[in-house]
């Protein structure tokens, strides 16, 4: 995990943050881990007025009303899709985590990243528009990898999946005879379904 992050020029920090970075490299889905002991209730909103916010890179930034933010109730804890804040940072003593795996609007993230002069690996991915179905897959992957490292850890709450606009389910129809003719072999229907 650490070797792969270093090959991709992503610095290693602590296990929980490293797992989110690893999954971003593996699946393309950015995630953010908040110290669960510092978070009561996650709220996603834009601020009513401008304010100063210190991001994880220890830089004080001016947040304007058109910047999408993540709040703990009314306290800002992250710039949505770009970078978290210092106040909810994962540290070595973190024993509880609130995991964010989201799908933020690419245009909004790009404008905020540009205005803040803060382009990150996460913002670069959000700018390209992500598959909303990857968010749950990324959360499940995080849990699996964490349990591989620490089998005693447990998921303390239900996973919440909120869609602003649900994508319609797509059905793909194809002719099995065409698949057999194209591949030159007879592939069982069950294997085709499993592969798809």
Q: Where on the chain are the PLM-derived regions?
A:
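RNA/tRNA-interacting regions in translation and RNA-turnover enzymes
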Residues: 4-7, 11-196
């Amino acid at each position: 995990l650490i070797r792969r992050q270093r090959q991709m020029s992503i610095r290693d920090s602590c296990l929980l943050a490293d797992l989110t970075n690893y999954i971003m490299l593996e699946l393309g889905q950015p995630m953010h881990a908040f110290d669960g002991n510092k978070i009561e209730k996650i709220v996603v909103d834009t601020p009513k007025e401008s304010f100063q916010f210190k991001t994880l890179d220890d830089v004080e930034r001016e947040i304007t009303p058109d910047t999408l933010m993540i709040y703990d109730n009314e306290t800002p804890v992250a710039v949505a899709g770009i970078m978290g804040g210092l106040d909810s940072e994962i540290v070595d003593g973190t024993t509880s985590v609130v995991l964010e795996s989201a799908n933020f609007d690419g245009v909004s993230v790009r404008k905020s990243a540009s205005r803040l002069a803060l382009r990150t690996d996460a913002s670069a991915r959000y700018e390209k528009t992500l598959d909303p179905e990857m968010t749950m897959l990324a959360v499940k992957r995080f849990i699996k990898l964490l349990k591989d490292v620490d089998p005693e850890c447990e998921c303390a709450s239900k996973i919440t999946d909120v869609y602003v606009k649900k994508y319609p389910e797509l059905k793909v129809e194809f002719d099995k005879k065409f698949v057999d003719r194209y591949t030159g072999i007879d592939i069982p229907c069950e294997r085709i379904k499993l592969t798809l």
